[in-house]
Design a protein with these regions (language model features):
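Interdomain/boundary linker segments immediately adjacent to catalytic/signaling cores
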Residues: 1-29, 292-305
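Catalytic cores of nucleic-acid endonucleases
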Residues: 79-131
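Conserved catalytic cores of phosphodiester-cleaving nucleases, focusing on short active-site segments
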Residues: 38, 63-83, 94, 103
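Short, solvent-exposed loop/turn elements at beta->coil junctions and helix N-caps
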Residues: 52-57
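Acidic-basic catalytic patches of nuclease active cores, encompassing PD-(D/E)XK
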Residues: 13-51, 67-69
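Non-catalytic C-terminal interaction segments of nucleic acid-processing enzymes
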Residues: 123-314
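Beta-rich catalytic cores
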Residues: 60
């Protein structure tokens, strides 16, 4: 062991590089303080915490190791940046040992947390998607579910306002600040339907909040799905797997990869939600294990007509 002193990091012990039992990452003050607090919190729960137990077969040491109801659980308190590739590699190591792991995030992850990182660290707690944080100021675990959202809106329940915001943002994105993706989708939409993006069918609007799953707003993917199924004749039939593959193919490169869950976990919910809405809008129907295209969704000549329709349904 060597004693390190630093101007910006507090004095701490670290393992020498090159030894046969691995070494800890350089630790910030928050990481050291939070790890101590998590250890004490686990003690209060009688989880028999141990600090940095080394597993030689995978060359990893979790920040804390717990024993909960006879089961071993690893805890990683992550304050520094961590790539998806490194996260997957660490989780694979724990998977080999059949040890579940809790990834608890520090305060740096509260700032400008984009979809990519949300999906990367999404875990399941009590059958719900969550991100876990540790608040060192209050010395407590924070279970955060606030990331459910609708495209282009901070609201979750006011469907009329969400729809208005989505229509206005689609106009803005298409005509004023088009990204390459929006520009291509706009041209395809105009070529195939003669309409602008803001005039898309009502079923394209995600008015029910969903957990992040893509690097683009879900409404862009949903419009793409409608354009894709319009290539098929009425009464075309898809098997369940064929239908899922069709929807996954749309904006394929924009699906985000989770680091703590099986790849299909979040995507499956997004696909099922849209499938159910397409059934509710009578675009498709289910017959045994097949989905049948029975109606082409209506594009609007005036986006304001959509607002009136939502008013009547509200």
């Amino acid at each position: 062991m060597i004693l390190r002193r630093g101007k910006h990091k507090i004095t701490h012990y670290a393992h020498k590089k090159g030894n046969d039992y691995g070494f800890s990452e350089g630790e910030t003050l928050e990481h050291l303080k939070g790890k101590k607090q998590i250890y004490q919190w686990a003690q209060k729960h009688h989880w028999n915490p141990q600090l940095e137990v080394y597993f030689p077969t995978i060359a990893q040491r979790p920040d804390i190791l717990l024993e909960i109801n006879g089961h071993t659980v690893a805890v990683e308190f992550q304050c520094s940046p961590l790539s998806l590739e490194k996260l997957l590699a660490r989780n694979e190591g724990y998977r080999q040992l059949k040890i579940p792991v809790w990834w608890i995030l520090g305060s740096p992850y509260l700032r400008n947390l984009r979809n990519k990182k949300i999906v990367q660290f999404t875990q399941i707690f009590r059958k719900q998607f969550v991100l876990l944080f540790w608040d060192v100021k209050r010395a407590q675990l924070v279970i955060n579910q606030k990331y459910w959202r609708c495209s282009y809106s901070r609201l979750k329940y006011d469907k009329k306002t969400i729809l208005m915001e989505q229509i206005e943002m689609l106009k803005k994105k298409q005509y004023h600040f088009p990204s390459k993706e929006i520009r291509e989708l706009s041209l395809t939409t105009l070529r195939l339907t003669g309409h602008a993006l803001s005039e898309c069918p009502l079923v394209c609007h995600d008015l029910i909040a969903s957990w992040p799953a893509m690097s683009i707003p879900i409404i862009i993917w949903r419009i793409g799905v409608i354009l894709e199924i319009e290539k098929f004749p009425l009464f075309y039939s898809w098997g369940d797997k064929e239908w899922k593959n069709l929807l996954m193919k749309v904006n394929k490169s924009d699906w985000l990869f989770p680091g703590c869950l099986p790849p299909e976990t979040i995507r499956k919910i997004i696909i099922n939600q849209y499938t159910n809405e397409l059934i509710a809008f009578k675009v498709i129907c289910r017959e045994d294990n097949h989905l049948i295209l029975i109606h082409r969704p209506q594009w609007f000549n005036d986006a304001q007509l959509k607002l009136q329709l939502v008013k009547r349904r509200s």
